[in-house]
UniProtKB/Swiss-Prot annotation:
Its EC number is 2.1.1.182. This is Ribosomal RNA small subunit methyltransferase A. It comes from Aquifex aeolicus (strain VF5). Gene3D superfamilies: Ribosomal RNA adenine dimethylase-like, domain 2, Vaccinia Virus protein VP39. GO terms for molecular function: 16S rRNA (adenine(1518)-N(6)/adenine(1519)-N(6))-dimethyltransferase activity; RNA binding; rRNA (adenine-N6,N6-)-dimethyltransferase activity. The record marks N105, T198, Q202, R204 as: Interaction with RNA. Belongs to the class I-like SAM-binding methyltransferase superfamily. rRNA adenine N(6)-methyltransferase family. RsmA subfamily. InterPro entries: KsgA/Erm, rRNA_Ade_diMease-like_C, rRNA_Ade_Mease_Trfase_CS, rRNA_Ade_methylase_Trfase_N, rRNA_adenine_dimethylase, SAM-dependent_MTases_sf. Its main location: cytoplasm. PANTHER family: DIMETHYLADENOSINE TRANSFERASE, DIMETHYLADENOSINE TRANSFERASE-RELATED. Keywords: Cytoplasm, Methyltransferase, RNA-binding, rRNA processing, S-adenosyl-L-methionine, Transferase.
Amino acid sequence: MVRLKKSFGQHLLVSEGVLKKIAEELNIEEGNTVVEVGGGTGNLTKVLLQHPLKKLYVIELDREMVENLKSIGDERLEVINEDASKFPFCSLGKELKVVGNLPYNVASLIIENTVYNKDCVPLAVFMVQKEVAEKLQGKKDTGWLSVFVRTFYDVNYVMTVPPRFFVPPPKVQSAVIKLVKNEKFPVKDLKNYKKFLTKIFQNRRKVLRKKIPEELLKEAGINPDARVEQLSLEDFFKLYRLIEDSGE
């Protein structure tokens, strides 16, 4: 019997209806390559294999779970014992659909890694904490990761999933989100862009002129006395380009 490890933040989704809904949101067609993050006991893996995909890669860090997944025995399935928060998705193909019930303690890192691999991931469907889903949409306590993701993807809220649909039940509500690639602004150096965003989100209560030269804010058409949460997606990009060009 497979044991769940608390350190991995594992909560297994056991609702057949929700599992099917997640798979449906991927719009799997014949010839598609799908990457599942954190296959666990294979509940979602088995549902995905009911679709006409060409190849299913499952990235799973827990070695005990890896052996369990391999026992499914489908020739289209390949299990990879790696950390999905660092794994180069694009090494698996040029166009991938990524999916997963993400462990809560590393969900943000996996989503960040998905953005770094955006050139080969036009679509991703993830289960995350409801609070994380709302933040990513920019509807609640927007942070740097929300802006980072929304620069390259539309974030769609699919459904809320209550704790009773998991084993063991988490203490919080969960949600399914769908990321659809829609690069709104051309950013070449993603690590530099992340550095800019994390810096601007530090000391959120400070007005922007305390963090960024006032002349750059005015050139971007931004009120120097505004705070970071008042900026639009376009504001962030304009400011980033100006700072990049000025060498600040």
